[in-house]
Amino acid sequence: MKIQVINKSKHALPEYATGQSAGMDIRANLDEPIVLKPLQRCLVPTGLYIALPEGFEAQIRPRSGLAIKKGIGVLNSPGTIDADYRGEICIILVNLSSEDFMIEDGERIAQMVVARHEHAEWQEVEVLDETERGAGGFGHTGKK
């Protein structure tokens, strides 16, 4: 699949780390570092603009290493970039740790996964089909 991209950043285009990677790392595009304080959130520019084909979205997800090592996540995870959005991709990061986190220019801050999606149509009914699970949720299967 080809995706049109404008790269106004100082960095190379995102790429897959391996042949089986689902996501591409996205880098911060900053004129100066950002200090993200504990429990603070900020919008981090990437300098990337894309045009996805109809029927696709780009999901912005946290990087697992930043999450476990530094407590840094994507606040609206996954963030969705719709196929008709043409603005700059910016990432909402949140610091869930107890220490300041410095975001440097070029740092890999999130990953992007391109995914197909469908539009759904609502079909109003009076009763839903029964299933074995039923209304069970939020830990209904217990600890095993």
UniProtKB/Swiss-Prot annotation:
Cofactor(s) needed for function: Mg(2+)
Catalytic activity: dUTP + H2O = dUMP + diphosphate + H(+)
Sorted UniProt keywords: Hydrolase, Magnesium, Metal-binding, Nucleotide metabolism
EC code(s) of this entry: 3.6.1.23
Pfam families the record matches: dUTPase
Pathway given in the UniProt record: Pyrimidine metabolism; dUMP biosynthesis; dUMP from dCTP (dUTP route): step 2/2
BP GO terms, sorted: dUMP biosynthetic process; dUTP catabolic process
Residues binding substrate: R63, S64, G65, N76, T80, I81, D82
Name of the top EC class for this enzyme: hydrolase
Metal-binding as UniProt keyword: yes
Superkingdom in the source lineage: Bacteria
GO MF terms held by the record: dUTP diphosphatase activity; magnesium ion binding
Key word Metal-binding present: yes
Function: This enzyme is involved in nucleotide metabolism: it produces dUMP, the immediate precursor of thymidine nucleotides and it decreases the intracellular concentration of dUTP so that uracil cannot be incorporated into DNA.
Family under the similarity heading: Belongs to the dUTPase family.
PANTHER family cross-referenced by the UniProt entry: DEOXYURIDINE 5'-TRIPHOSPHATE NUCLEOTIDOHYDROLASE
Protein name: Deoxyuridine 5'-triphosphate nucleotidohydrolase
Organism: Phocaeicola vulgatus (strain ATCC 8482 / DSM 1447 / JCM 5826 / CCUG 4940 / NBRC 14291 / NCTC 11154)
Name of the coding gene: dut
